[in-house]
């Protein structure tokens, strides 16, 4: 393909319709046809990145290989397409404005008055086209966060309007709207969609394809009505009905001809429809699974999206073990020595989740002690690993006051300590150890056997690490340091070989797990959780 094609995904009526899933599905379908694609997300908030946002408000903060803290939708992009994203795939209004202001301070605008139009819109346009120019993608899919009509989204809509005009046949708009079902009237209502499209048209954008989110099936009469009132071809009105799994969406979109309609709009001969063989095999394997494996997530954020990548990695791993993964959230704030047996009852394995701050950590320590002493498969991630280390120090090494410097700066047994390069940092945003780092695994360790190699790369997001001053004591007592960064000598993985499955990682393996390539640690953890279930229940 000689010229990069640009697809803009916008949303209307309400937020949280699933623009990220639709963008990922579009990418998957085009990728299945052999095209080189990438997906980027523009978020209209003024934060530089979501790294300091409350998980209750924003959900999980996803980390790219090059260390960018991003929206959780980038996790969907990677899980669907198996393509790693970078800083260029995630933009916010804060970063756009900062870039423009920095240029103004540098004198790049030669004394001109800096305005939203053209300077902010030009910077948006530059970032949209950057990936196409720099990397030569066939398709660049750009998801615009928020909803048409939001004040925050106005500069992005103006930039899209200009790009559609400038790029002509090489640009296309997919608009996602909502068709509500009124139970009392027994009717599906298209008026919100019509108003959303009118709002889009009022800023100069005519949608090329409409995707209608709905809880009920839309018949052809409704689709024809929407097509007529919104100036969209009938075959370009696609419905996205609620499905049991987000991984069914690409197949559903393909069955309705979404990829075919897009290619025709671009003047490209669609050719033969791809089979999506490996993807469908995953879905078939998931559907055939009749047995369940129960995993408890010990954490402090009860919003499901706060641990989105962990949840998806566990679901994927369950499928590859021919089991359905059933997840139960266990609030660590409510865990005590007195109730832990009751709270963790019925779980075949436990994940001690990541997080920050004092709240809920003692409950994680309680969980780590219970699973260690009862030989329950346990997977500690980031802060979860640190709590496993602290619990071991308190109850095996005998350091009852052992803690992390994050929680107690004056603890004499700081088994978790702040990294040297972090000690003089005062800013919170974008200053942690972020992105992919190399890790060398100890020969003969369980994790080395799981990975099948000694050198790996995993993504990090933390300031605190295992204190190497205590390593010999830990290893003499049975907790082994089996993964290290070769440059800094930081401990990245601990395990207790004598237990069924007791592994903690300082990194976030969930970021590397995709539908077609599940992460080996999660697959092996689920396998041993299933084995534990058989031992307990026969």
Task: List each model region and its residues.
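Cysteine-nucleophile active-site neighborhood
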Residues: 17-20, 24-28, 32, 343-438, ...
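Short low-complexity, flexible loop/linker segments enriched in glycine and/or proline
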Residues: 52-55, 225, 393-396, 497-499
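Short beta-alpha connecting loops at secondary-structure transitions
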Residues: 57-65, 243-247, 352, 373-379, ...
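C-terminal and late-domain segments of enzyme folds
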Residues: 434-438, 442-538
């Amino acid at each position: 393909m000689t010229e990069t094609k640009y697809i803009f995904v916008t949303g209307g009526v309400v937020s949280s319709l699933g623009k990220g899933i639709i963008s990922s599905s579009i990418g998957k379908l085009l990728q299945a046809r052999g095209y080189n694609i990438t997906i980027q997300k523009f978020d209209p908030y003024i934060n530089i990145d979501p790294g300091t946002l409350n998980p209750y408000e924003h959900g999980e903060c996803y980390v790219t290989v090059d260390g960018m803290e991003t929206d959780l939708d980038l996790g969907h992009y990677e899980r669907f397409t198996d393509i790693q994203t970078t800083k260029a795939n995630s933009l916010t209004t804060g970063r756009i404005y900062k870039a423009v202001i920095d240029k103004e301070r540098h004198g790049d605008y030669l004394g001109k008055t800096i305005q939203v139009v053209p300077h902010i819109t030009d910077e948006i346009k530059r970032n949209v086209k950057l990936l196409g120019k720099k990397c030569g993608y066939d398709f660049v899919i750009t998801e615009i966060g928020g909803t048409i009509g939001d004040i925050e989204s106005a500069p992005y809509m103006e930039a899209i309007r200009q790009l559609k005009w400038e790029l002509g046949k090489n640009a296309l708009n997919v608009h996602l709207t909502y068709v509500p079902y009124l139970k009392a009237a027994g009717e599906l209502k298209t008026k919100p969609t019509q108003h959303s499209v009118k709002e889009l048209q009022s800023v100069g954008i005519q949608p090329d394809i409409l995707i209608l989110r709905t809880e009920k099936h839309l018949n052809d009469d409704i689709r024809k009505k929407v097509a007529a009132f919104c100036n969209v071809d009938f075959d370009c009105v696609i419905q996205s009905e609620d499905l049991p799994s987000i991984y069914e969406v690409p197949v559903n979109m393909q069955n309705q001809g979404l990829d075919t309609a897009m290619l025709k709009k671009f003047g490209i001969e669609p050719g033969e429809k791809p089979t999506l063989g490996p993807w469908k095999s995953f879905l078939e394997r998931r559907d055939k699974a009749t047995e369940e494996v129960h995993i408890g997530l010990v954490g402090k954020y009860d919003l499901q999206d706060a641990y989105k990548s962990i949840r998806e990695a566990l679901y994927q791993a369950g499928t590859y073990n021919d089991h359905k993964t059933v997840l139960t959230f266990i609030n660590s704030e409510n865990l005590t020595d007195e109730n832990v047996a009751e709270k963790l009852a019925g779980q075949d394995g436990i994940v001690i989740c990541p997080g920050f701050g004092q709240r809920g950590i003692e409950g994680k320590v309680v969980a780590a002690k219970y699973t260690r002493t009862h030989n329950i498969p346990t997977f500690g991630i980031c802060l979860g690993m640190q709590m496993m280390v602290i619990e071991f120090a308190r109850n095996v090494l005998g350091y009852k006051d052992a803690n992390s410097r994050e929680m107690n700066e004056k603890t004499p047994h700081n088994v978790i300590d702040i990294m040297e390069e972090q000690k003089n940092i005062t800013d919170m945003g974008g200053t942690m150890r972020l992105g992919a780092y190399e890790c060398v695994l100890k020969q003969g360790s369980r994790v080395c056997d799981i990975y099948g190699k000694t050198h790996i790369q995993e993504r990090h997001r933390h300031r605190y690490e295992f204190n190497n001053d205590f390593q010999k004591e830990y290893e003499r007592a049975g907790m082994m340091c089996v993964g290290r960064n070769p440059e800094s000598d930081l401990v990245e993985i601990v395990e207790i070989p004598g237990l069924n499955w007791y592994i903690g990682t300082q990194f976030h393996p969930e970021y590397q797990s995709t539908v077609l390539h599940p992460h080996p640690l999660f697959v092996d953890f689920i396998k041993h959780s299933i084995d534990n279930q058989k031992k307990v229940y026969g």
